[in-house]
Amino acid sequence: MAKQNNKPIIDDLISSLVQVLKVKKNLILQGAPGTGKTYIAKKLAASMIGKDFEESSQFKIVQFHPSYTYEDFVRGIIVTTDNDGNLTYVPTNKILADFAKEANDNYVDSHKESLAVNKLNWVREQWSKYKTYLSQEMQGNEDVKIGNYILTGVNPSNIVIGTYNLSDNLIVEAYIAREIDHDKEYTPPYFLKATWTTVSVFSSYLQEHNQTYQAPNGVLKDKIELKNFILIIDEINRANLPMVLGELIYALEYRGRKVETLYNVEGDNNIILPPNLYIIGTMNTADRSVGHIDYAIRRRFAFEYIESRNIKDEKLQDGEKFDDKLFNSVQKIFDNQTWLSEEFDKRDVAIGHSYFITTKVMSREMRIKYEIRPLLEEYIKDGILKKEYGGKQIQEELNSILK
């Protein structure tokens, strides 16, 4: 049978999770070892940032561990030495605060007005005022002239001089080109003489009323693109999350709001988690020895189970093969309560498909000896798998499967 392309399976999942992430901002991919949680997290990053995401400043990945603290992840103190050899304790941003600042800077800048838009809005406003003035002049005079042209109409989106219908957009564009940008190569698309005459008269009117365009502070030359920033936290439940996140548990939900922190960095106690910062955690559900995710944190994350599946009909990388026979045999151990402890759910512990992919450097025998068997024996030791059932030892079952 010809192998099917696995793109629809993965793409549908990624597309669905992107929509979830855009709404919730925080997502945890949970499942047994080897189900591809980190792989899917990176696929999400590629979808939201681009295929070269790992080289981008918009992407970070960190792995939690039991001794991970707030001072490692959010803000902490570093010790420096001055010129006299004295120790100085300096509050500093760590991974999350630093990344959040970068994301927030982009978010704020992307909402700033560009210079081009600012100029356009200013000229439109002045042109509107000038049209109001022209309308008033027409009511009190029989002939109102713009240069040598008689003004015959002032309408919501244009004026009429002589036989020429000049749109507001035409005059505004021409005024910006000549009077602000000093673009000598600009030529109006039509009504050349009438347009330049109107621009000249309009310019004189503004000068008489002391109106000159000046770019205000904070206006950017070019519009800044709003970018997505992705932080992957691998093994997120291995750390004590309430301790690591601290007051930022609030910020996870209330994006864009200032949250006061324990440390003052460069005169500012606050941290903002902006709407364009997305957090993806991965969680090994088989590991019961790690930290518990409490309800306050759980409420702020969306959770998605990534389950073990048979991928024999999915496209793999060159040189990779999926041992579906071995996969199916091992999965049977978890299919019922014969060997699986009643306290556990199959989807939390069933060994993932990545354990059954062989390559030129990772043979079937190596997978079994160094990965599959050690994990299953750890499961037995932890009580996930029963040592015996109906007088049969599980080691006998493993020996018959793993050969």
Predicted features along the sequence, with ranges:
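C-terminal regulatory/interaction module of P-loop NTP-utilizing enzymes
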Residues: 1-403
